[in-house]
UniProtKB/Swiss-Prot annotation:
It is found in: Cytoplasm, Myofibril; Cytoplasm, Myofibril, Sarcomere, A band. Muscle myosin is a hexameric protein that consists of 2 heavy chain subunits (MHC), 2 alkali light chain subunits (MLC) and 2 regulatory light chain subunits (MLC-2). Residues 667-689, 770-784 are annotated as: Actin-binding. One of its GO terms (biological process) is muscle contraction. Keywords: Actin-binding, ATP-binding, Coiled coil, Cytoplasm, Methylation, Motor protein, Muscle protein, Myosin, Nucleotide-binding, Thick filament. Belongs to the TRAFAC class myosin-kinesin ATPase superfamily. Myosin family. Residues 86-791 form the Myosin motor domain. PANTHER family: MYOSIN, MYOSIN-11. Residues 942-966, 1006-1029, 1131-1213, 1234-1255 are annotated as: Disordered. This is Myosin-3. It comes from Caenorhabditis elegans. The rodlike tail sequence is highly repetitive, showing cycles of a 28-residue repeat pattern composed of 4 heptapeptides, characteristic for alpha-helical coiled coils. Limited proteolysis of myosin heavy chain produces 1 light meromyosin (LMM) and 1 heavy meromyosin (HMM). HMM can be further cleaved into 2 globular subfragments (S1) and 1 rod-shaped subfragment (S2). Residues 857-1969 form a coiled coil.
Length: 1969
C-alpha cells in the first residue's frame, strides 16, 4: 500500500486491514542480518525463525527463537526477508519468495486479524472465525473509487478494481473465489455481490410488482436476496463447515454503459445430488428440509402431510439434525422473505415445498422381496400415497412404475420386474433427479427475476464460487471432476498471469522471452479429457455391456500406466486412507482415486416409466416444468416413427448423454466465458480445524497454499522480475549508495546512474535487474542485497558523523580552555602589579590626587564634546544623504530578500526534513543500541543460565555422591548401633541372675534380632531393587541419549540425565526414609520391651500383641514398597514428561535436603533413645545383680549362644557392605558407560561428517559424469538431427525444385504481360502479406488455445490440424510468390510490356484466387473468434513476421540459384543418371539401412552407456552400503566366523562386479569408437555419393565400388557390434541379478536427478539410523553377554550354596531327631520331677494342685514342641510353602512363650512359699526347661537361616530369569530388524523388475521410431522418383515453351499460380512428407 488516507486510519475497521506508520517504522528499525537470520523447518510450526551461529561444510548450527540450538543441513535453511517486509501487504514484493516467508507473513498478519493479503494477482483470505468491522458502509465508502495500491488489501479493493476496469476498458470482468469447504467462499461471494449492488445502485425499484403490490423489490435487493434462496436449497452442514455450498456458481452482475446496475444471472456447476439421499456422519442434508420441519408456518407441515418428527424421514435424518448457532425457524422466515422479494408466486413456492416434502416421503417408501421371486412389491402404501399426492400423480401407478417399469424388448414394450435392490436404487435416483432439476429451475427462475429488461446490458462482472482442490482419504468421481475443474482454472491463471507480466514488460521496454506456464498443466488436462483419456474411457465403459468399475480401472492401467507421466499406480494406503485403483499427478499433488461406483455415477440412470408419470403431473405444475426437456424411451420411439427429430435430453433411442458429458460441456462454457473476461483471483484459506480465531495450523495452511496455486503463482513470479520500484522511490531510498550519480534531477537518470555505480562495484549484475520506462525491475533477492549495502553505508556514515561531532566538541573544549587561560593570565598580571604598587608611596599619592583632577578637566571635556557634536551633526547630514541612497537600494534588496526568503524557507524545509531524518536515525540508532544491549544481556543471561545449569548438574552429581556416602555412613552407624545393642544385650544377659528373667530376655533378644535381620533383609532387597532401578534407569538414559544424539541436543541430554539422577536420588531417599521408619518402629518396640522388663514383665502379653501388630504393619509396609515399585515403573514411563518439569528439580532437591535433615534428626533421636535404653539397662542390671552369682553357669551357656548370634550378625553386616560396594561398582560402571557413550557420540558425529563429505564428493563426481554424458548425448543428437535435416533438406529442395519448374513454365509464358500489373500485384502482394501476418497471428493464437478446443469434437480437431498444415504451406507459398515476383520484376524490366489483355485476365483470375484465400481466412477467423483478444494483442509480431518473410524470400533466391546449378548438372548428367539410377537406388537403400542400423546401435549404446554409468556409480556406493549393512547385521546376529565368511564372499562378489563393470565399460568404449568410425565412414560415403553425381561416369563407378566395399565392411562391423551388444546384454543381466538395490537410484536417475539426490539422502540417513541401532544392539548384547556370564557364575555359586543348604538341612533333620529323643527323655524327667514335687508338697494341698496343673501345662508344652518339630520337617520337605509354615511356627512359638510365661509366674508364686528343698527341686526342673527352650531356639535359628538362604537363592534366580528374558527380547528385536531389512530388499527387487519392464518399453518405443524412420526413408525415395518425373516434365515444358514462344497463350490460362492450388499442392506435399 503506497499510502493510507488519514480519515481511513480513524475508521474502526482499519486495525484489521492495515498497519500504522509508527508500527511500520518501528518494525523496519528492528535489527536484522540477512546472512544470519533464516527460516528452518519445524514439525509443529512449519517453519521457525532462527539465527545462524556457525557453518561447518553443509551443516549449519542455528539458535531458534524458542531458544533451542540445533544443527541442520544448509539446504534446509530458507532466506528471511528484512524487517521492512514484515506483515507486507503484497507477498509478491518479498525479496525472498519461499514457503517459509509466505507462511510467516500470513501468520503475522493473521495474529493481528488482518485476514486479507495480496500475493501478486491473488488476494489471499484467511477465515477469521469471528465478526470483524471491515464490511461496514463506511469501509465501503473508503474503498469506492480508490486504486488497489492506495488502500490496504481487501475484498472491496479487488471488487472496485474490477468495477473500474469494466467501466474504463469496456471489458467484462470475472472474480474467481476458490478454497476448501469452510474457508469462507460463500461469505466472500455475498460481500462481493453486496458491494456491486451498492456501487451500481440505480435507486429505482426494478422488481416486478405483483397484483397486490406486496411482491418484489428493487433490483439491488433482489440480487442480494438470491443468496438466502440458493443457500436454503444448495447449502448444507459438513464436518468442517456449518453452511457449506455444495455446488459451484458463477453469478454475473450486469451493468449499463454508465456503470449502473442492469440485472444479473446465475449459472451453477457440480451440484452434490447424493446428499439428498445419503449423509456422512457429522453432516446433514440441505437446509430447506429442516427449515420446512422447523414449524415456522404451523399450517405448512399439515399441507405437506409431514405429521411425523424429523427423525422419521430417513433421507434427511441419517446424521445431524440441528446446527449450533443456527435457528432453522428464523432461517425459514428469511427464505420465505427472500422468495417474496424475488417475486416468486405463492403457487411456485408451494410447489417447491411440496416437491421437497415428496422427496422426504419417497425416502420412507417401503418395499419387500417376494419369496422365491426376483420381484419386489410395496410394503405399505401410506408414504407412497403422501409422496404421490405431493408430486401430483397416482400412487398405484407410481408404485407400479417403480416395481414393474416398461422396457422395450425388440419392437414391443413389456413390464419388467425389479428386485428390491433395483427398486431402492430407482427411488434414490429419482429423488436425486427431482431435487437437481428443481434446483436448476430455481436458478432459472431467479435469472428471470434478475433480468431487468428496461435497462440495456453492456458489460458484466462474474463471481465464480467453486470448491477448491480436494485430496481426501477416499477420492471418488466427484473429487475427480472438482480437481479437473481446478486444474483448468489453474492453467487459466498461469496463462493470464504471464500474459499480464509480458504486457508490463513490453510497456516498460524490457527484453523478455514469453513463457506460457499454462502449458505446464496441459499434460494432466489431456490425460483426463483427451480421446482415450480417463473421461473418454469412462464414457465408453458406460455403453459397453457387462462393464464394471474394475474393468474400467484395468483399462486405465493398460492404457496409461507407464505411458503417461501424470498417471501412476496408487501406493498402498496409509493410516485412514481408503483403497485406490489409480492415481493422477495434479499440480497440487498426487491424488489416489477409487473407481468404485464411477460407472453408476456417470450414467445416473432413471426410471423412464416413473419420469413419464411425473411429466403428466396433474397437481404440481413444477413437475411439468422441470421434466419438460426430458424425452423418455417411448417418446423417442414415437418421434422416430413420426420422422421427427428427437430433441429430448435422454433416452436410449436418442443420444446417450452421461454426467461427464454434461459436466464437460458446462466446464467448457465456463472456460470460454472466463477467457473472454479480465479475471481477478480470490483464494480462501482455512486457518485450523478447530474453528479458533487467531490460530494458524501451519501444515494445513501450507497444503491449501499448494492446492490453491498460491505457491505455484510465486514459482511463476520468480521466473521473471517479481520486485519493482518507481524511479523516484528508488532514488529516494538508495541514493546513498551512489551520491554522485543521485545528483541528477531526473529520477530515471539518477536511478540508472546508481545502478551503474553498484554494477561497476561488482555488487550487481545486469541479469539481476532491468530498467524500464517508469520502473526498475529486480530478480528475487536483489532488494535484500541492496538493503544490506544501504545498511553498511548508513553504518559508515553514522560512524563518521559521530566521529565528526566528537571532534568538534573536543576542539570547542580546547578553544574554551585557551580563552580561559588568556583571561587568567591578565588577571594574574594585574593582581601581581597591584600587589607591587599598593605599598608604593607615590601610588598612594596618585590615588589621593586623581579624584581632585576631574573637576579641572570637565571644561576641557565640554569643549571636546562640542567638537564631537559638530562632527556628529555633519556625519548625520552625510548619513541622511546616504540613507536616501540606501533606501532605494533597500527597496531593491527587499525584493531580493523575499526571493531569498522563499529559497530559505525551502532550504529550511529541506533542513527540517534532514533533521527529522537525522532524528529518526538517532532514534533508530538508540533503538538498535538498546536492542543490542538487550540481546547482549539476554545472551549473557543465557550463558549464565547455561553455566548455572552446568553448576547445578555438578552440584547434583556431588549431592548424589554425598547422599550415597551418607547412606554408607548410615549403614555404618546402623551396624555400630547393632553392635552396641548386642553388647548391651550381652551385658544384660551376663548380669541376669534370675532364670526366668534371663530366659525371657534371651528370647526377646532373639526376636529382636529376627526383626533386625528382617529389616536388614528388607534393606538388602531395597538395595537390590535400587540396583535394578539403576540398571533400568541406565537403559532409559541410553535410550534418551540415543534420541539426543539424533537431535544433537547436548544440553537437553544433560538435563534429562540430571532429572533421572534426581529421581533415582529421591527414590533412594524415599526408600531410606521407609527403612528409617522401620528402624524407628523397631526402636519403639525395643523401648516398650525394656519398659516391660523394668516393670518385671507384667505387661509381657500386651507387648507380644504389639509385636504382632508391628508385624502386620511391616507386612503393610512391604505391600506399600511393592506399590511404590509399581508406581516407580509408571513414573519411568512418564520420564518424557519429566523433561518439561525441570524447574521442579530445585524444589525437589530442597525437599530432599529437608528429608535428609529430618533423617539426621531422627538418627539423633535414635541416639537419645539408645541413651535412655542404656539407663534402663543399668537399672535392670542393678535389679538383677543379686541373682548373678546363682546364674553364672547359665551365663556361660548364654555367652556361647550370643557369640554365635554376633557372628551371624557380623556376616549379615559384611553381606550388606559387599552389596554397597557392588552398588558403588555399578555406579562407576554406569559412569564409564556414560563416558563411553559420549565418545561413541563424538565418533558417530565424525563419521557422519565424513559420510556427508564423501557423499558430497560423490554428488560432485556424479554431476561431472552427468555433464559429460549430456554433452555426449547432445553431440549424438546433433549428429542425428544433421542426418535428418539433410534428408529433409534434400526432400524439400526436390519439392521446391519441382514447384519452381512449374512456376518457371508459367512465368515464361507470361513474362511480357507483367509490367502493367506491377503496381496491382504490389498492392495485392501487400494485401497477401497482411493476410499472411493475420494468419500468422491466428496460427499463434490457435496454437496457444488449441489445447483448450480439442474437446469439442473429433471432426473439428482434424479440421484444425489440416488448417494448421494449410497455413504452414500457405506461408511457404507466399515466400515462393515473393521470389517469383522478384523474378517477374527482373524479367519484366528486361523483356518489356506485352499482352495487356492476357495480363488483365490473369489479374482477374488472381483476384478471384485472392478472394478465395480471403474467404478461407475469414472462415478461420470465425472458428477462432474466442481468441480475438489474444490476436489483437499479438499484432506487435507483425514486424517479426515481415522479417521472416524477407528471410524466406532470401532463402528462396538462394535455392533458386542452387536450382539453376542443379539444372545444368541435371542436363549434363541426365543420361548417366538414368543409367545408374538403379544402382544408386540400391546403394541408397543400403545406405539407409546402414544408417538405420547405426542409429539403432547408437541408441542402444547410449542407453547401455547410461545404464552402465549409473550402474557403476550406484554399484560403488551400494556395494559399500551392502558391506556396511552386512557387517552390521553380522555384528547383530552372527558369529565372527560367519561375518568374516560373508565379508569375503561380498568382497569376491564386489571384485566380480567391478570386473564386469570394467569389461562393460571397455565394451562400451569400443562400441562408441566403432560408432564414431561408422559415422565418419557414413559421412564420407554420403559426400562421395554427392560428388559422384557431378563427376564422370568412371569416377561414379569407382565410388559405387568403394561404397560397396564400405558397406561390406560396415556390415561386418555391425555384426561384430551385434555380438558385442549381446555380450553386453549378458553382462547387464548378470549385473541385474547381482545388484538388488539399484532400482530406486536407476528409476530416479531416469526421472530426475533431484529425486535421486533425495533418495540417496534418505537411504544414507536410514543406513546411519540402522548403523546406530545395530551398534546399540551390539553394545546391549555385549552387556547382556557379560551379565549372562556373571549370572552363570552366580548360578554356580548358588548351586554350591544350595548343596551346602541341603547338607545343613540334613544336619538340621538329624538335630531335630536328636531333639525329639531328648524331648522324650525330658518328658520322663518331668514326670519324675512332678512325682517328686507332689511328694514334697503333701502338707500343702493347695500348692500341690497348682503344681499338678503346672505339670499338665508342661506336658502340653511338650506336645506343642513335638508339633513344632513335625512342622519344621514339613517345611524342609516343602520349600515352596516355607514362608507360610514359618509364620505358623512363629505363632506356635509365641503361644508356647505365653504358656511358659504363665507357668513362670506360677513358679514364682510357689517359690515364695516353698522351702529350700522345694527351691532346689524347682531349680533342677528349671534347668531342664531351659535346656529344652535352648534347643527350640537353636532349631528356630537354623530354620530362619535356611529361610533367608532360600529367599536369597530365589531372588538371584528371579534376577537371572529376568536377564535371560531381556536377552531373549533383544534377540527377537534383532530378528525383527533382519525381517525389515529383508522386506526392504524384496521391495527393491520388485522395483528393479518394474524398471526392467520400463527399459523394455523404451526399447519398443525405439523400435517404433526406427520403423518410422524407415517409412520416411521410403518416402524420400518416392520423392526422388518424383523429382525425376519433374525433370522430365521440365524438359518437355521447355520444348513446349520454345515451340510456343511466338504464340499467345489461350484464353483463361492461369498466369499466376493460385493460392488455393498452391495450398493444395503444399498440403499434398506435406502429407507426402
Amino acid at each position: 500500500m503506497s499510502g493510507n488516507p488519514d480519515a481511513f486510519e480513524n475508521d474502526p475497521g482499519f486495525p484489521f486491514l492495515g498497519i500504522s506508520r509508527e508500527a511500520r517504522a518501528a518494525t523496519a528499525a528492528r535489527p536484522f542480518d540477512s546472512k544470519k537470520n533464516c527460516w528452518i523447518p519445524d514439525p509443529e510450526d512449519g517453519f521457525v525463525a532462527a539465527e545462524i551461529q556457525s557453518t561447518t561444510g553443509e551443516q549449519v548450527t542455528v539458535v531458534t527463537v524458542k531458544g533451542n540450538q540445533i544443527t541442520v543441513k544448509k539446504d534446509q535453511c530458507q532466506e528471511m526477508n528484512p524487517p521492512k517486509f514484515d506483515k507486507t501487504e503484497d507477498m509478491a514484493n518479498l525479496t525472498f519468495l519461499n514457503e517459509a516467508s509466505v507462511l510467516g507473513n500470513l501468520k503475522d498478519r493473521y495474529k493481528d486479524l488482518m485476514i486479507y493479503t495480496y500475493s501478486g494477482l491473488f488476494c489471499v483470505v484467511i477465515n477469521p472465525y469471528k465478526r470483524l468491522p471491515i464490511y461496514s458502509e463506511s469501509v465501503i465508502k473508503h474503498f469506492m473509487g480508490k486504486r488497489r495500491n492506495e488502500m490496504p488489501p481487501h475484498l472491496f479493493a479487488v471488487s472496485d478494481e474490477a468495477y473500474r476496469n469494466m467501466v474504463q476498458d469496456k471489458e467484462n470482468q470475472s472474480m474467481l473465489i476458490t478454497g476448501e469447504s469452510g474457508a469462507g467462499k460463500t461469505e466472500n461471494t455475498k460481500k462481493v455481490i453486496s458491494y456491486f449492488a451498492i456501487v451500481g445502485a440505480t435507486q429505482a425499484a426494478s422488481g416486478k410488482e405483483a397484483k397486490d403490490g406486496k411482491k418484489g423489490g428493487t433490483l439491488e435487493e433482489q440480487i442480494v436476496q438470491t443468496n438466502p434462496v440458493l443457500e436454503a436449497f444448495g447449502n448444507a452442514k459438513t464436518v468442517r463447515n456449518n453452511n457449506s455450498s455444495r455446488f459451484g456458481k458463477f453469478i454475473r452482475t450486469h451493468f449499463s454503459g454508465s456503470g449502473k446496475l442492469a440485472g444479473g444471472d446465475i449459472e451453477h456447476y457440480l451440484l452434490e445430488k447424493s446428499r439428498v439421499v445419503r449423509q456422512a456422519p457429522g453432516e446433514r442434508c440441505y437446509h430447506i428440509f429442516y427449515q420446512i420441519m422447523s414449524g415456522n408456518d404451523p399450517s405448512l407441515r399439515g399441507k405437506l402431510k409431514l405429521s411425523n418428527d424429523i427423525t422419521y424421514y430417513h433421507f434427511c435424518s441419517q446424521a445431524e439434525l440441528t446446527i449450533e448457532g443456527m435457528d432453522d425457524k428464523e432461517e425459514m422466515r428469511l427464505t420465505q422473505e427472500a422468495f417474496d422479494i424475488m417475486g416468486f408466486e405463492d403457487n411456485e413456492t408451494m410447489d417447491l415445498y411440496r416437491s421437497t416434502a415428496g422427496i422426504m416421503h419417497m425416502g420412507e417408501m417401503k418395499f419387500k422381496q417376494r419369496p422365491r421371486e426376483e420381484q419386489a412389491e410395496p410394503d405399505g402404501e401410506e408414504d407412497a400415497l403422501n409422496a404421490a399426492a405431493m408430486l401430483g400423480i397416482q400412487a398405484e401407478e407410481f408404485l407400479k412404475a417403480l416395481t414393474k417399469p416398461r422396457v422395450r424388448v425388440g419392437t414391443e414394450w413389456v413390464n419388467k420386474g425389479q428386485n428390491l435392490e433395483q427398486v431402492n436404487w430407482a427411488v434414490s435416483g429419482l429423488a436425486k433427479a427431482i431435487y437437481a432439476r428443481m434446483f436448476k429451475w430455481i436458478i432459472t427462475r431467479c435469472n428471470k427475476t434478475l433480468d431487468a429488461k428496461e435497462i440495456e446490458r453492456k458489460h458484466f462482472i462474474g463471481v465464480l464460487d467453486i470448491a477448491g482442490f480436494e485430496i481426501f482419504d477416499l477420492n471418488s468421481f466427484e473429487q475427480l471432476w472438482i480437481n479437473f475443474v481446478n486444474e483448468r482454472l489453474q492453467q487459466f491463471f498461469n496463462h493470464h498471469m504471464f500474459v499480464l507480466e509480458q504486457e508490463e514488460y513490453k510497456r516498460e521496454g524490457i527484453a523478455w522471452t514469453f513463457i506460457d506456464f499454462g502449458l505446464d498443466l496441459q499434460a494432466c488436462i489431456e490425460l483426463i479429457e483427451k480421446p482415450l483419456g480417463i473421461i473418454s474411457i469412462l464414457d465408453e465403459e458406460c455403453i459397453v455391456p457387462k462393464a464394471t468399475d474394475m474393468t474400467y480401472a484395468q483399462k486405465l492401467l493398460d492404457q496409461h500406466l507407464g505411458k503417461h507421466p501424470n498417471f501412476q499406480k496408487p501406493k498402498p494406503p496409509k493410516g485412514k486412507q481408503g483403497d485406490a485403483h489409480f492415481a493422477i499427478v495434479h499440480y497440487a499433488g498426487t491424488v489416489r482415486y477409487n473407481a468404485t461406483n464411477f460407472l453408476e455415477k456417470n450414467k445416473d440412470p432413471l426410471n423412464d416409466t416413473a419420469v413419464a408419470l411425473l411429466k403428466h403431473s396433474t397437481d404440481n405444475s413444477l413437475m411439468l416444468d422441470i421434466w419438460q426437456d426430458y424425452q423418455t424411451q417411448e417418446e423417442a420411439a414415437e418421434a422416430a416413427k413420426a420422422g421427427q427429430t428427437a430433441g429430448g435430453k435422454r433416452g436410449k433411442s436418442s443420444s446417450f448423454a452421461t454426467v461427464s458429458m454434461i459436466y464437460r460441456e458446462s466446464l467448457n462454457n465456463l472456460m470460454n466465458m472466463l477467457y473472454q473476461t479480465h479475471p481477478h483471483f480470490i483464494r480462501c484459506i482455512i486457518p485450523n480445524e478447530k474453528k479458533a480465531s487467531g490460530v494458524i495450523d501451519s501444515a494445513l495452511v501450507l497444503n491449501q497454499l499448494t492446492c490453491n496455486g498460491v505457491l505455484e503463482g510465486i514459482r511463476i513470479c520468480r521466473k521473471g522480475f517479481p520486485n519493482r520500484m518507481l524511479y523516484p522511490d528508488f532514488k529516494h531510498r538508495y541514493a546513498i549508495l551512489a551520491a554522485d550519480a543521485a545528483k541528477e534531477s531526473d529520477p530515471k537518470k539518477a536511478s540508472v546512474g546508481i545502478l551503474d555505480k553498484i554494477s561497476v562495484d561488482g555488487n550487481l549484475t545486469d541479469e539481476e535487474f532491468k530498467v524500464g520506462e517508469t520502473k526498475i525491475f529486480f530478480k528475487a533477492g536483489v532488494l535484500a542485497k541492496l538493503e544490506d549495502l544501504r545498511d553498511e553505508i548508513l553504518s559508515r556514515i553514522v560512524t563518521m558523523f559521530q566521529s565528526r561531532i566528537r571532534s568538534y566538541l573536543a576542539k570547542a573544549e580546547v578553544r574554551r580552555r585557551y580563552e580561559q587561560q588568556t583571561g587568567l593570565l591578565v588577571v594574574q598580571r594585574n593582581v601581581r602589579a597591584w600587589c607591587t604598587l599598593r605599598t608604593w608611596e607615590w601610588f598612594k599619592l596618585f590615588g589621593k590626587v586623581k579624584p581632585m583632577l576631574k573637576a579641572g578637566k570637565e571644561q576641557e571635556a565640554m569643549g571636546e564634546l562640542a567638537v564631537k557634536i559638530q562632527k556628529l551633526e555633519e556625519a548625520v547630514q552625510r548619513g541622511e544623504i546616504a540613507r536616501s541612497q540606501l533606501e532605494s537600494q533597500v527597496a531593491d534588496l527587499v525584493e531580493e530578500k523575499n526571493a531569498l526568503f522563499l529559497s530559505l524557507e525551502t532550504e529550511k524545509a529541506n533542513l527540517a526534513d534532514a533533521e527529522e531524518r537525522n532524528e529518526k536515525l538517532n532514534q533508530l540508532k538508540a533503538t538498535l543500541e538498546s536492542k543490542l544491549s538487550d540481546i547482549t544481556g539476554q545472551l549473557e543471561d543465557m550463558q549464565e543460565r547455561n553455566e548455572d545449569l552446568a553448576r547445578q548438574k555438578k552440584k547434583t552429581d556431588q549431592e548424589l555422591s554425598d547422599t550415597k556416602k551418607h547412606v554408607q555412613d548410615l549403614e555404618l552407624s546402623l551396624r555400630k548401633a547393632e553392635q552396641e545393642k548386642q553388647s548391651r544385650d550381652h551385658n544384660i544377659r551376663s548380669l541376669q541372675d534370675e532364670m526366668a528373667n534371663q530366659d525371657e530376655a534371651v528370647a526377646k533378644l532373639n526376636k529382636e534380632k529376627k526383626h533386625q535381620e528382617e529389616s536388614n533383609r528388607k534393606l538388602n532387597e531395597d538395595l537390590q531393587s535400587e540396583e535394578d532401578k539403576v540398571n533400568h534407569l541406565e537403559k532409559i538414559r541410553n535410550k534418551l541419549e540415543q534420541q539426543m544424539d539424533e537431535l544433537e541436543e547436548n544440553i537437553d541430554r544433560e538435563k534429562r540425565s540430571r532429572g533421572d539422577i534426581e529421581k533415582a536420588k529421591r527414590k533412594v531417599e524415599g526408600d531410606l526414609k521407609v527403612a528409617q521408619e522401620n528402624i524407628d518402629e523397631i526402636t519403639k518396640q525395643k523401648h516398650d520391651v525394656e519398659t516391660t522388663l523394668k516393670r518385671k514383665e507384667e505387661d509381657l502379653h500386651h507387648t507380644n500383641a504389639k509385636l504382632a501388630e508391628n508385624n502386620s504393619i511391616i507386612a503393610k509396609l512391604q505391600r506399600l514398597i511393592k506399590e511404590l515399585t509399581a508406581r516407580n515403573a509408571e513414573l519411568e514411563e512418564e520420564l518424557e514428561a519429566e523433561r518439561n518439569s525441570r524447574q521442579k528439580s530445585d524444589r525437589s532437591r530442597s525437599e530432599a535436603e529437608r528429608e535428609l535433615e529430618e533423617l539426621t534428626e531422627r538418627l539423633e533421636q535414635q541416639g537419645g533413645a539408645t541413651a535412655a535404653q542404656l539407663e534402663a539397662n543399668k537399672k535392670r542390671e542393678a535389679e538383677i545383680a543379686k541373682l548373678r552369682r546363682e546364674k553364672e553357669e547359665d551365663s556361660l551357656n548364654h555367652e556361647t549362644a550370643i557369640s554365635s548370634l554376633r557372628k551371624r550378625h557380623g556376616d549379615s553386616v559384611a553381606e550388606l557392605t559387599e552389596q554397597l560396594e557392588t552398588l558403588q561398582k555399578l555406579k562407576a560402571k554406569s559412569e564409564a558407560e556414560k563416558s563411553k557413550l559420549q565418545r561413541d557420540l563424538e565418533e558417530s558425529q565424525h563419521a557422519t561428517d565424513s559420510e556427508v563429505r564423501s557423499r558430497q564428493d560423490l554428488e560432485k563426481a556424479l554431476k561431472t559424469i552427468e555433464v559429460q554424458y549430456s554433452e555426449l548425448q547432445t553431440k549424438a543428437d546433433e549428429q542425428s538431427r544433421q542426418l535428418q535435416d539433410f534428408a529433409a533438406l534434400k526432400n524439400r529442395l526436390n519439392n521446391e525444385n519441382s514447384d519452381l519448374n512449374r512456376s518457371l513454365e508459367e512465368m515464361d509464358n507470361q513474362l511480357n504481360s507483367l509490367h502493367r500489373l506491377k503496381s496491382t500485384l504490389q498492392s495485392q502482394l501487400d494485401e497477401t502479406r497482411r493476410n499472411y501476418d493475420e494468419e500468422s497471428r491466428e496460427r499463434q493464437a490457435l496454437a496457444a488455445t488449441a489445447k483448450n478446443l480439442e474437446h469439442e469434437n473429433t471432426i473439428l480437431r482434424e479440421h484444425l490440424d489440416e488448417e494448421a498444415e494449410s497455413k504452414a504451406d500457405l506461408t511457404r507459398q507466399i515466400s515462393k510468390l515473393n521470389a517469383e515476383i522478384q523474378q517477374w520484376k527482373a524479367r519484366f524490366d528486361s523483356e518489356g510490356l506485352n499482352k495487356l489483355e492476357e495480363i488483365e485476365a490473369a489479374k482477374k483470375a488472381l483476384q478471384l484466387k485472392v478472394q478465395e484465400l480471403t474467404d478461407t481466412n475469414e472462415g478461420l477467423f470465425a472458428k477462432i473468434a474466442s481468441q480475438e483478444k489474444v490476436r489483437f494483442k499479438l499484432m506487435q509480431d507483425l514486424d517479426d513476421a515481415q522479417s521472416d518473410v524477407e528471410k524466406a524470400a532470401a532463402q528462396v533466391a538462394f535455392y533458386e540459384k542452387h536450382r539453376r546449378q542443379f539444372e545444368s548438372i541435371i542436363a549434363e548428367w541426365k543420361k548417366k543418371t538414368d543409367d545408374l539410377s538403379s544402382e544408386l537406388d540400391a546403394a541408397q537403400r543400403d545406405n539407409r539401412q546402414l544408417s538405420t542400423d547405426l542409429f539403432k546401435a547408437k541408441t542402444a549404446n547410449d542407453e547401455l552407456a547410461e545404464y552402465l554409468d549409473s550402474t557403476r556409480r550406484e554399484n560403488k556406493s551400494l556395494a559399500q552400503e551392502v558391506k556396511d549393512l552386512t557387517d552390521q547385521l553380522g555384528e547383530g546376529g552372527r558369529s565372527v566366523a560367519e561375518l568374516q565368511k560373508i565379508v569375503r564372499k561380498l568382497e569376491v562378489e564386489k571384485e566380480e562386479l567391478q570386473k564386469a563393470l570394467d569389461e562393460a565399460e571397455a565394451a562400451l568404449e569400443a562400441e562408441e569408437a566403432k560408432v564414431l568410425r561408422a559415422q565418419i565412414e557414413v559421412s564420407q560415403i554420403r559426400s562421395e555419393i554427392e560428388k559422384r553425381i557431378q563427376e564422370k561416369e568412371e569416377e561414379f563407378e569407382n565410388t559405387r565400388r568403394n561404397h560397396q566395399r564400405a558397406l561390406e565392411s560396415m556390415q561386418a562391423t555391425l555384426e561384430a557390434e551385434t555380438k558385442q551388444k549381446e555380450e553386453a546384454l549378458r553382462i547387464k543381466k548378470k549385473l541385474e541379478s547381482d545388484i538388488n538395490d539399484l532400482e530406486i537410484a536407476l528409476d530416479h536417475a531416469n526421472r530426475a536427478y533431484a529425486d535421486a539426490q533425495k533418495t540417496i539422502k534418505k537411504y544414507m540417513e536410514t543406513v546411519q539410523e540402522l548403523q546406530f541401532q545395530i551398534e546399540e544392539e551390539q553394545r546391549q548384547k555385549d552387556e547382556i553377554r557379560e551379565q549372562f556370564l556373571a549370572s552363570e557364575k552366580r548360578n554356580a555359586i548358588l548351586q554350591s550354596e544350595k548343596d551346602e543348604l541341603a547338607q545343613q538341612a540334613e544336619a538340621a533333620e538329624r538335630a531335630r531327631r536328636n531333639a525329639e529323643a531328648e524331648c522324650i527323655e525330658l518328658r520322663e524327667q518331668n514326670n519324675d520331677l512332678n512325682a517328686h514335687v507332689s511328694a514334697l508338697t503333701g502338707q500343702r494341698r493347695k500348692l500341690e494342685g497348682e503344681l499338678l496343673a503346672a505339670h499338665a501345662e508342661l506336658e502340653e508344652i511338650a506336645n506343642e514342641l513335638k508339633n513344632a518339630v513335625e512342622q519344621g520337617q514339613k517345611a524342609s520337605a516343602d520349600a515352596a510353602r516355607l514362608a507360610e509354615e514359618l509364620r505358623q511356627e512363629q505363632e506356635h512359638s509365641m503361644h508356647i512363650e505365653r504358656i511358659r510365661k504363665g507357668l513362670e509366674l506360677q513358679i514364682k508364686e510357689m517359690q515364695i512359699r516353698l522351702d529350700d528343698a522345694e527351691n532346689a527341686a524347682l531349680k533342677g526342673g528349671k534347668k531342664i526347661i531351659a535346656q529344652l527352650e535352648a534347643r527350640i531356639r537353636a532349631i528356630e535359628q537354623e530354620l530362619d537361616g535356611e529361610q533367608r538362604r532360600h529367599q536369597d537363592t530365589e531372588k538371584n534366580w528371579r534376577k537371572a530369569e529376568r536377564r535371560v528374558k531381556e536377552v531373549e527380547f533383544q534377540v527377537v528385536e534383532e530378528k525383527k530388524n533382519e525381517e525389515r531389512l529383508t522386506e526392504l530388499v524384496d521391495k527393491l527387487q520388485c522395483k528393479l523388475k518394474i524398471f526392467k519392464r520400463q527399459v523394455e518399453e523404451a526399447e519398443e518405443v525405439a523400435a517404433s521410431n526406427l520403423n518410422k524412420y524407415k517409412v520416411l526413408t521410403a518416402q524420400f525415395e518416392q520423392a526422388e522418383e518424383r523429382a525425376d518425373i519433374a525433370e522430365n516434365a521440365l524438359s518437355k515444358m521447355r520444348n513446349k515453351i520454345r515451340a510456343s514462344a511466338s504464340m499467345a497463350p489461350p484464353d483463361g490460362f492461369p498466369m499466376v499460380p493460385s493460392a488455393s492450388s498452391a495450398l493444395i499442392r503444399s498440403s499434398s506435399n506435406a502429407r507426402f512428407l
